[in-house]
Amino acid sequence: IGVAVECKDGYLMGSDGCKLDCLMKKGTYCADECSRVKGKDGYCYLWLACYCYNMPDSVKVWERATNRCGKGK
């Protein structure tokens, strides 16, 4: 019997609710950050924000519908 594990992909989110920026960061920054949250891999999308693959469902990612970036806390 196989066990299905759901994983998610998405933009990492900083404590301010914004996408985690990768502009002017070292080349492995996003892969390192994705690994830190137990994602399989990640990259700097258009040199602007970290996008990660296969993260645990518990990791909060940026979503347009719940965006609070720049809106205060």
Curated annotation (Swiss-Prot):
GO biological process, alphabetically ordered: defense response
Assigned GO CC terms: extracellular region
Signal sequence region: 1-7
Origin superkingdom: Eukaryota
Subcellular location: Secreted
Cystine pairings recorded for this chain: 18-69, 22-44, 30-50, 34-52
Modified residues (Lysine amide): 71
Note: Negative results: does not affect the cardiac Nav1.5/SCN5A, the peripheral nerve channel Nav1.7/SCN9A, and the voltage-dependent potassium channel Kv1.5/KCNA5.
Recorded domain comment: Has the structural arrangement of an alpha-helix connected to antiparallel beta-sheets by disulfide bonds (CS-alpha/beta).
Function: Beta toxins bind voltage-independently at site-4 of sodium channels (Nav) and shift the voltage of activation toward more negative potentials thereby affecting sodium channel activation and promoting spontaneous and repetitive firing.
Name assigned to this protein: Toxin Td11
